[in-house]
């Protein structure tokens, strides 16, 4: 409908969020909601907790929390970080969630994590599941091509991070 939503300013990065916004606009228009009200809602929406949530943004460091627990979500979060900080070094800290998910998607997790500059994996969080022999965070780590990768116990993570020059 013409120039509807020209120059809309969004607070959420990433192609996946743009697709979500496009769908929300389409539904709003179909429901007869005015452009003003749709724009106001979208421009004020800050996202949800633990989905590309900026925890800290300083001159030299940025901390973003994202509870991506599926390879496609993880890839989308990494691509969003790259779009926000294209020339910055991005370190990802990933804790696999569930033995079955790790087993079923290990290759896809490894491929997504390879998009980072450096990765630290911590121990798998089993939630409600019993351990599956041979499945751990190392299952993903061993499939990764990335050279800058490590496994660190969660209890040692802060000390390990203090030794690094962090960026994103």
Language-model regions, residue ranges each:
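C-terminal helical cap/extension that packs against the catalytic core
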Residues: 110-165
